[in-house]
From Swiss-Prot:
Pfam families: NADHdh (PF00146). It catalyses: a quinone + NADH + 5 H(+)(in) = a quinol + NAD(+) + 4 H(+)(out). It comes from Blochmanniella pennsylvanica (strain BPEN). The chain crosses the membrane at residues 16-36, 82-102, 115-135, 150-170, 187-207, 238-258, 266-286, 303-323. This is NADH-quinone oxidoreductase subunit H. NDH-1 shuttles electrons from NADH, via FMN and iron-sulfur (Fe-S) centers, to quinones in the respiratory chain. The immediate electron acceptor for the enzyme in this species is believed to be ubiquinone. Couples the redox reaction to proton translocation (for every two electrons transferred, four hydrogen ions are translocated across the cytoplasmic membrane), and thus conserves the redox energy in a proton gradient. This subunit may bind ubiquinone. The lineage of its organism: Bacteria, Pseudomonadati, Pseudomonadota, Gammaproteobacteria, Enterobacterales. The keyword Translocase applies. The gene is nuoH.
Length: 323
């Protein structure tokens, strides 16, 4: 009896250790993505970028952290104080929650959830509340317009995100991400589900508010949108949560369409990290290469292009499975 309790205790400690390590690494990577993006954009635009702190600017994150810590943590007197403080915390926590169900390797997974896809869709929908609360609590017209834009964009593209995943779910027969990865042992889903991959990629960028879908934060129109009244640590929480969302979307693309940890020659964790890193590079290069469309064009892309594509993909997948 005591032996079994010791085994359970050791297993719980091991699982908690894995969870803490994964979450800390993801937060650190989310913070470091700012430096990586600035360096890559500088390389793309034929300039130097941040290169003064550390070797080739590698310690720029430390300099940014010191700057943020010593900034005034100001709360506007005309804002709703409780909601204003709560919004970035909700954004940060909701961005981390989706990490719980991602299978990095066959053994490195925090929560092996049988309804992992539904949990991911629920967490992605939760981010709308943080944005709306931030825009409303700021009591600023630009923040409110940005929040309304973000809510409409997120709710619209969540439809296409969910429909693009349904083809993969129908093919593998499960909502469990680990089973979906194991189903891609001989053929990655990106080949039979290429249309679903394209729509998931576009919808994922829209949910992250990544360029060219960053209308809620467009500096030229809204002076940074719902971020406008935030500074210091609270702004950093929004900033890091945006990059964590980008890492989450890249990880889900790898899991759903590129075989997850599976591949030749290298250990599973190295393969997963490499695939995710390459997708993050693609996200950054898209920001460097493409202009920002108008807000009405963003909604048109969703409802008139992505929606028919996802419905066609789901229908064709169902026909192939039935035949």
């Amino acid at each position: 009896m005591f032996g079994s309790s010791e085994i359970v205790t050791k297993h719980c400690v091991s699982e908690i250790f894995h969870a803490v390590i994964i979450l800390l690494v993801v937060v650190a990577c989310g913070a470091y993505m700012s430096f990586l993006e600035r360096r890559l954009l500088a390389l793309f635009q034929n300039r130097y970028g941040p290169n003064r702190v550390g070797w080739h600017g590698s310690l720029q994150l430390c300099a940014d952290l010191i700057k943020v810590m010593f900034k005034e943590d100001w709360i506007p007197p005309f804002s709703d104080r409780i909601v204003f403080v709560l919004a970035p915390v909700i954004a940060f926590i909701s961005s981390l929650m989706s990490i719980l169900i991602i299978p990095f390797t066959p053994t490195w997974i925090i929560w092996d959830c049988n309804i992992g896809i539904l949990f991911f869709l629920m967490m992605s929908g939760l981010t709308v509340y943080s944005v709306l609360l931030a825009g409303w609590a700021s009591n600023n017209k630009y923040a409110l317009i940005g929040a309304v834009r973000a809510a409409a964009q997120t709710l619209s593209y969540e439809v296409f995100l969910g429909l693009s995943i349904m083809g993969v779910v129908a093919k593998s027969g499960s909502f469990n991400l680990k089973i979906i990865v194991e189903d891609q042992l001989y053929l990655w889903n990106v080949i039979p589900q290429f249309v679903g991959f394209i729509t998931f990629f576009l919808a994922g960028m829209a949910l992250c508010h990544r360029h060219p879908f960053d209308q809620p934060e467009s500096e030229q129109e809204l002076a940074d949108g719902y971020h406008i009244e935030y500074s210091g640590i609270k702004f950093s929480l929004f900033f890091i949560s945006g990059y964590i969302n980008m890492i989450v979307i890249a990880s889900f693309i790898v899991t759903l369409f590129f075989g997850g940890w599976q591949g030749p020659w290298f250990p599973p964790m190295i393969l997963f990290i490499t695939k995710t890193f390459l997708l993050l590079i693609v996200f950054i290069l898209i920001r460097a290469a493409l202009p920002r469309p108008r807000y009405d064009q963003v909604m048109l892309i969703g409802w008139k292009i992505c929606l028919p594509m996802t419905l066609f993909n789901l229908l064709s997948t169902a026909v192939v499975i039935l035949l």
